[in-house]
Amino acid sequence: WGFSSARGVATIVETILEWIDVLVVTEFLGAAAGGIYGAVNRCVRVGTMIEHTGRVVTGPSISAALATRQLDRARDIFLSTTRVLTALSWPFYLSLAFFGPTLLGFFGKGFEAGAGILWVICPAAMLSMSAGGVQSVLLMSGKSRWQLLNKLSSLVVAVTLNFTLVPVWGLYGAVTAWASALLIDTFLASYQVFRLVGIRASAREMAPSLFLGAAVPTVCALASLAFLGQSVLGVIVYVVLLVPVYGAVLYRFRKALGIERFLSARRAKS
């Protein structure tokens, strides 16, 4: 009951964190600003689907390893998951940041005004993803109360900064609060997993995912923007360029990126 109740409350807190900044922006800056910020919010949170997928795929394997005190196996699964999360999520967030004006323009006229704040939240989301499935490790190791305390700390930061910064900085105040809350949660969970649970990934082990996940999308985006600028055609060319190139890179370095181990964990689960 203690585990389930803490997890249930943490889920409620997560939901509040998703909407608190949108509500504050709407209250202080009006419905139009709230709509723009809400569009950015929804776009960025699509990336969390990658993390949730990783949690579902590898969670049971990590739980089994921890239950049998196979810390090395749990670490191997965590490392491969972290590499894959980084390799898949970083291109998504970089795409949002580089082509924010065009992508937000699909929501309607004026929404491109929110493109600038993507350069605040997307790097924060990338850092959070590079920490890997720390939330999953906390849950699978039975530390749901730790996770709840992390979420509550994040909520305090979000509420405090939103009410302090939104009246002064507008949308940038809200996104600063969001990024700060996200990084606080990530830092606390990472510290607990690295220091207290004993599972961590080194910078050397993460280097291939970090480099390739940043370099390939950036080069493709800059090439498209240089020739076509911010346009729908530019986005199309970027996607047509990125998908085969990055797909080939992922396949070529599938072992170094942990993709094979990640897929083997999925097969073991099924």
Predicted regions mapped to residue ranges:
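Alpha-helical transmembrane segments of multi-pass membrane transporters
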Residues: 146-171, 181-194, 208-225, 241-251
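Helix-loop junctions and terminal segments of transmembrane helices
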Residues: 40-82, 135-140
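Membrane-proximal transmembrane or re-entrant/amphipathic helices at the cytosolic face
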Residues: 222-270
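Interfacial segments at transmembrane-helix termini and the short loops linking adjacent helices
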Residues: 79, 96-126, 132
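Interhelical loop/hinge segments that connect adjacent transmembrane helices in multipass membrane
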Residues: 1-19, 57, 61-76, 196-210, ...
